[in-house]
Amino acid sequence: MAAVTSVSFSAITQSAERKSSVSSSRSIDTFRFRSNFSFDSVNVRSSNSTSRFVVHCTSSSAADLPTVADTKLKFLTAYKRPIPTVYNTVLQELIVQQHLTRYKKSYQYDPVFALGFVTVYDQLMEGYPSEEDRNAIFKAYIEALKEDPEQYRADAQKLEEWARTQNANTLVDFSSKEGEIENIFKDIAQRAGTKDGFCYSRLFAVGLFRLLELANVTDPTILEKLCAALNVNKKSVDRDLDVYRNLLSKLVQAKELLKEYVEREKKKRGERETQKANETVTKCLGDYQYAGR
């Protein structure tokens, strides 16, 4: 993914939409996709069930740390309404990944990670029927991880606003400048360089990519320079951005199938109602004719 910085998230999604030509006669319940993100089994049944398996965070020895099942249960308890599975499946897999990162000894919250999650979440939930529900799900999700949803949103917005004022050179040259955002990057670089209090994750990689996109960076070498300045492994970032791009493509296909399914159900329901109305009219006319004899 050498030229990853020249491709925007919106361009990825639009490209996937052009490529997704899925037959409407295909059963939506059998549609599945797999990626290295472990997001799979997408269909349109509403589901709020939680997995029975329990995954313990082996990177910490604290006996009182919550399990994955605890975190998922907390999320489902906070948001009780059914979520269409095309969204819920990815959310459930994502919360597993984020739980395991969240409870590592080396984990420390940072705004780039928050920007990455907000970006992924907003891409995933784009087109969700209710904005109110979308916000409620976000709140329940972050609070299930014992973090602050308002901080996630505020920090993501702050980074986005800053990135829009940057260019390729100023984005990389943060170490020679003073400022709130520059100090955040310096702190990340220091922690990543000493391996003390820094936990790299795929969401962090997405956060970096989002910064480059907002700064209108088209030079593919800038990502490499930014990774070097932050003491982050460029190969890991490239790999994880490839996975995310694949996820976006699969989500477009799944949502298209969901849309087709809903439209077919509406059509069937309309046909049934029309048939029922015709039968009622016919019966009434028959009764009227019989009564008039």
From Swiss-Prot:
Membrane-crossing residue ranges in chain numbering: 198-220
Domain of life of the organism encoding this protein: Eukaryota
Intervals, Cytoplasmic compartment: 221-293
Any Pfam family matching the protein: ThylakoidFormat
Lineage: Eukaryota, Viridiplantae, Streptophyta, Embryophyta, Tracheophyta
Organism per entry: Solanum tuberosum (Potato)
Role this protein plays: Involved in a dynamic process of vesicle-mediated thylakoid membrane biogenesis. Required for the normal organization of vesicles into mature thylakoid stacks and ultimately for leaf development.
GO BP: photosystem II assembly; protein import into chloroplast stroma; protein import into chloroplast thylakoid membrane; thylakoid membrane organization
InterPro entries: Thf1
Keywords in alphabetical order: Chloroplast, Coiled coil, Membrane, Plastid, Plastid outer membrane, Transit peptide, Transmembrane, Transmembrane helix
Gene Ontology cellular-component annotations: chloroplast outer membrane; chloroplast stroma
Main location: plastid
Keyword Membrane in record: yes
Locations listed in the record: Plastid, Chloroplast outer membrane; Plastid, Chloroplast stroma
Intervals, Chloroplast intermembrane compartment: 46-197
Family, per entry: Belongs to the THF1 family.
Transit peptide start-stop: 1-45
Membrane topology qualifier: Single-pass membrane protein
Coiled coil spans: 240-273
Entry protein name: Protein THYLAKOID FORMATION1, chloroplastic
